[in-house]
Amino acid sequence: GIITGCDKAFVVDKNDKNLQKINGKFLKNWIKNKDIGKYIINNSQSMLIYSNDIKNEEEEEFLVETFLKPYKQKLQNRRECRRNYRKWYELQWGREKYLFEQKKIMYPYKSRSNKFAIDIDNTYGSADIYSFYIKDEYKNEFSYEYLVGLLNSKTYDKYFKIIGKEMGKKVFDYYPNKIMKLKIFKDENYDEIEALSKEVVSLSRQKIMVSNELNTYINECNGK
């Protein structure tokens, strides 16, 4: 995931009215470890300012002055800025955008159980999140829905805990080197597993949509 070096500067509430005044190309969906559930990513109220795309800070004066300038001293004191590897307004480690701007599976770096979620919204994540995508040569062999169906199953939860490392209090670390050791099987039940997993994903997304609608009505009632 991304290391900002100062979340207060780069991570903002998506309801902040000032966001309407800046170019949308600098705003990315942003989640942390806690936002990942089984199968889907829960709604996050945060956006990331991807300031590495700023070519000239003077041209983006409102963005810089409003969100970044208040933390300039702290941003300048980051190691990479002191060594002139980064401009003061850039993310500490912004990573390559293509890693985030594609369909992928995201998962937390530590958890008590397997939590693998499909992302279709080009979501960016913090350093406590890992992700992977299906290589082109395997896209006709496996679907994302099939994979999360396997990985979130009780069988694969037990499987991972055999090879994974417990950090304490039944919390396991999910470092990529361990995840990549998991064997993925495919047999005559593939279509059924995929179909059931697609159903779970669909129902989970519907649940979030209904929950959001409910909260909207309640907020409107409280505002009267």
Give residue ranges: language-model regions:
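Polybasic, glycine- and aromatic-enriched phosphate-binding surface used to engage nucleic acids
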Residues: 1-192
